[in-house]
Design a protein with these regions (language model features):
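Short glycine-rich His-centered loop
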Residues: 2-25, 79
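Nucleotide donor/acceptor-binding cores
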Residues: 3-4, 60, 159, 196
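Short beta-strand segments
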Residues: 6-9, 63-65, 162, 175
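N-terminal [4Fe-4S]-dependent radical SAM core
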Residues: 14, 124-163
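Glycine/Thr-rich phosphate-binding loops of Rossmann-like dinucleotide-binding domains
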Residues: 15-16, 72, 119, 171, ...
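Alpha-helix N-cap and loop-to-helix initiation/capping positions
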Residues: 22-26, 69, 109, 113, ...
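Glycine-rich beta-alpha loop elements in corrinoid/cobalamin-binding modules
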Residues: 30, 34-143
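Radical SAM [4Fe-4S] cluster-binding motif and immediate context
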Residues: 145-197
Length: 197
């Protein structure tokens, strides 16, 4: 039986400024990677609230990403899903930094890099026993897949390609080392060029 996954990039409509302007929005690469890692028996839909507001639909699973700026809206969407009996999973920077907070709103939290843990979560979900918390680890660069861009149906002005992860600097104001570690990891240049084409 086919299953349906809805991936949502929430936008906090109460905030003003560039973060809510479609002309400055960018593709959420993390959700594109999740789409790449999701097996073919799942139908995938994607909503970016910079362009289109979330509305409840018949899906098996809703996946949310989160920066701190949009976490309140992500929690709002999760609450709507819960009211309608839809299972929610949340990842991204905010959920990774504050997993206990996120757990108060969603069914499952995935913290850290998701490449190695998303397939495990999906297997558990399909078996009917998903965990409440999964901790991802630093993904070897050769296992970082290309972003599945066909799900991005909106007229993004900006496009991104992730060429590396991690940073050795550990600046106080930055979350990169907490999320991706202090080891700087570069993707293979041929793989990056292939993705750009």
């Amino acid at each position: 039986k086919r299953k349906k996954l809805l991936l949502v990039n929430p936008v906090n409509r109460e905030s003003a400024g560039l973060v809510n302007d479609p002309s400055t929005s960018f593709m959420p690469l993390g959700l594109g990677i999740i789409a790449t890692l999701t097996p073919d028996h799942w139908d995938i839909e994607f909503i970016d609230e910079s362009f289109e507001q979330f509305s409840v639909s018949r899906v098996d699973l809703v996946g949310l990403t989160s920066f701190t700026s949009n976490a309140p809206r992500a929690y709002e969407i999760a609450s709507i899903c819960r009211e309608n009996g839809i299972y929610t999973v949340m990842g991204g920077v905010h959920a990774s930094m504050l997993p206990e907070e996120a757990k108060g709103y969603v069914d499952t939290v995935i913290a850290g890099e998701a490449e190695l843990i998303w397939p495990v979560f999906l297997c558990d979900f399909e078996a009917g026993n998903p965990g409440q918390f999964y901790q991802g680890s630093a993904t070897p660069v050769e296992l970082i897949p290309q972003v599945r861009r066909d799900i991005f149906k909106y007229p993004y002005v900006n496009d991104l390609v992730q060429t590396s992860r991690g940073c050795p600097m550990g600046c106080d104001f930055c979350s990169v080392t907490q999320l991706c570690g202090k080891q700087y990891r570069e993707r293979d240049i041929e793989d990056v060029l292939d993705e750009m084409e």
